Amino acid sequence: MITKILLPHDGTEMSKRAVDKAKEFAKAFNGEILLLYVIEDIPIPATLILGNERTWISQTKRSIAKKLEEGWMKMAQEKIISNLANENIKAAAKVLIGSDSSPAEQIVKFAKDNQIDMIIMGSRRLEHISSKIKALGSVARRVSEAAECPVLIVH
């Protein structure tokens, strides 16, 4: 039974389509949707990390991540979770901030740690190759290869 659906969301059109597909599954199985946004760590060149700048850079990175988190949570609540609630679908949102692991690894670990039954995510079309080619982005591919639960990738 599919009762816990993880929906990694990055704001792209493909992620918006994935919301619609997750909604179908949640309705069919009386499931809940957990939106997940991963904020990647911001790499800083070693040449910039000198003396007192290290503290300032760390504080600035935390400040940027916090603003991204607040903005995404506001968007998730106003545009996604409230719409799902209007359709009687239970939903929540979570943000993961900067880690040594990749976004795909964080998604897979989160799914395992939270006993997710299914992951539904957008494919992230590779625009620079051709607008006619629908290809998997690296995060979707890696999640589909590593996840222990079923993964539905939406084009």
Map each language-model feature to its residues.
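Structural beta-alpha unit
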Residues: 78, 82-119
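Active-site phosphate/pyrophosphate- and oxyanion-stabilizing loops and adjacent acidic/basic residues
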Residues: 23, 108, 141
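Histidine-centered beta-alpha loop that forms part of the nucleotide-sugar donor binding/catalytic region
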Residues: 10, 96, 123-126
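General small-molecule cofactor/ligand-binding pocket signal
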Residues: 36, 92-96, 152
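Small/aliphatic-rich secondary-structure junction motif
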Residues: 1-62, 89, 146
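Generic structural signal for helix capping and beta-alpha/helix-loop junctions
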Residues: 42-43, 101, 128
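Gly/Ser-rich helix-loop-strand patches that form or flank binding pockets
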Residues: 111-155
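Alpha-helix-centered segments that form part of catalytic cores
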Residues: 67-78, 82
